[in-house]
């Protein structure tokens, strides 16, 4: 009964946004990590995303091993939900050891490779197929458009080939997460945005070495 009540308590805390309380409970009893791992298999995307963030926090506090964190993040990257995938990539980006061990490029390659495989045309496998733009690609194109330039929204929309609704959604996300900044209507990359762009470009250079 104690395990069941703890599971319910943790889930309720997560639903109510009380992440610090969840972290404290797990720090007091690391066996409760199993509950977080279980939630990662849930169909509730927001619950899954929050649990990814909790794992990232626990790793930074030394409560979760890098191999365990990477294992669960990679499992999420192979799913079909783009929001969960994006959050997994952003958590990976915050882990210095990932860059040192060159794991981030391998993981992103696995994700992109899955996307390509899903889009393959069985009639012509001689070249890589076109991949439908997803959230990662749209973010990449916005960051690339802003790089080394001070652009206003219309020029970014044109350079990244975005309609107004899509631009508004993504530019809001990038501003809120401090990948870009806006000053007097002009957008520029932050150091955090430059780092993300650099890592994605490294992956594309590995996939398309002749371009």
Swiss-Prot record:
One Pfam family of this chain: HTH_45
Transmembrane segments: none
InterPro entries: ARM-type_fold, ArnR1-like_HTH, WH-like_DNA-bd_sf, WH_DNA-bd_sf
Source domain of life: Archaea
Coiled coil: none
Protein name: Uncharacterized protein MJ0290
Organism of this sequence: Methanocaldococcus jannaschii (strain ATCC 43067 / DSM 2661 / JAL-1 / JCM 10045 / NBRC 100440)
Cleaved signal peptide residues: none
